[in-house]
Every structure is written in C-alpha cells, then in structure tokens.
Amino acid sequence: MNRASLEKNPHEVASMFDGVARRYDLTNTVLSLGQDRFWRRATREALQLSPADKVLDLAAGTAVSTVELASSGAWCVAADFSVGMLAAGASRRVPKVAGDATRLPFDDGVFDAVTISFGLRNVVDFSAGLREMARVTRPGGRLVVCEFSTPTNGLFSTVYKEYLMKALPAMATAVSSNPDAYVYLAESIRAWPDQRALARRIEAAGWSDVRWRNLTGGIVALHAATKP
C-alpha cells in the first residue's frame, strides 16, 4: 500500500507513514518552505507550558515536535501509531509510546496539556480522538490542535490550492521516499473542515473555551481549548 485513501484505514495510514519516516523531517521542511519550525514554536507558546506540566504530544511522528515542547522544561511524551516514525526519531531523547489516538494507553486525567500537530486529519474518527484526549487530560488542562486549515484571503487561497494539487506533489517526488503519501496529504487538506467547523467539533467532543489563531495566512490554524 503506497497511498492511504481518505477513508483512513488505520493500518494503511500507519504503513504509509512508516514508508516516509526516514526522510519525513527533511521533506516537511522543504515542502513548508521552512515554516514547520515556526509552527512548532507557535504550538509550544500556545500551550503556555511550565516545568511542572506533564504533556502528551500525540501523532508526534519522529518526536521533533516533542523536543520543541520539552524545551519549555515540561515533561513531554511522544505518542504515535506509526512505529516506523517513532523509530526514525530514536535519537531524540524524549519518552516515546506507540498508541492509537482513539484508544490511548494512559489513565484518566494524567496530563496537564495535550497537543496534536498535523495528525488529527489522519485519525479514523477524529471526534473520538478528541474525546479520548479529553479523557486523559485533567480538569482545567489545555488542548492545542495545530492543523492545516483554510486560507482567509480568496486570492491567496486560490494560489495555495494550486500549490497543493500541482507543485507539492512534484516537489515531493524530488525529496520524499513515497511521493504518493503527499498526494494523500494534499487531498486530505482539501477535505478538512475550516476553522469554524473544526472549533464546533472540538467543543462537541467535550472541550470548552474553544478559540483559534491563524498562522501563515490560514494555511495552518492553532485551535486551543480547555478541559472543563
């Protein structure tokens, strides 16, 4: 299986990410034109972490995002359902756990904060995933979802869609070990809810005080929420 369908069979999606793990970080930096570093930093800042916090970084992949979070001094664990991705990040000295976002291997209320970056689109039932994130977060704890979204400027949105469907696959062919995975990426972004619709889904999953902030003109949005 080289490319997961938008039906998101969990085993196929995990296999797809296993296949791109070796060059995943480099590919992301190239395809985002270096914006991935800014997005990781913005996610950390939105969580407002302290050294006393316990943080779950879900869909952490190679744990590059977890290392960014841990720079705050908080205790952070990387979780991902792609064993290949976790293995590719073996040199990063943070705790790592293999796990499914809809069945997390953690007790209730053990985390002060939970975050997921560019992974919610890949969860077979992302509303169930959001509920599971709420389960493992203590009352008053924080959620930050960093995800591709909908550009707010009409002209920019048109240019971005052209990039997604034409330029991105061509660039992925040059730098990725599995270019088909990035065709799936483009298609899944186009099918994803916009900022307001995602905020409603987060609230429906049991989170409160849901708000969002656009990054890079709305290419990415940070949704933040609180566990009641």
Curated annotation (Swiss-Prot):
Gene3D superfamilies: Vaccinia Virus protein VP39. It holds the Pfam family Ubie_methyltran. Signal peptide: none annotated. Keywords: Menaquinone biosynthesis, Methyltransferase, S-adenosyl-L-methionine, Transferase. Pathway: Quinol/quinone metabolism; menaquinone biosynthesis; menaquinol from 1,4-dihydroxy-2-naphthoate: step 2/2. SUPFAM superfamilies: S-adenosyl-L-methionine-dependent methyltransferases. The keyword Lipid biosynthesis does not apply. GO terms for molecular function: demethylmenaquinone methyltransferase activity. InterPro entries: SAM-dependent_MTases_sf, UbiE/COQ5_MeTrFase, UbiE/COQ5_MeTrFase_CS. Coiled coil: none annotated. S-adenosyl-L-methionine binds at residues 62, 80, 100-101, 117. Belongs to the class I-like SAM-binding methyltransferase superfamily. MenG/UbiE family. Methyltransferase required for the conversion of demethylmenaquinol (DMKH2) to menaquinol (MKH2). This is Demethylmenaquinone methyltransferase.
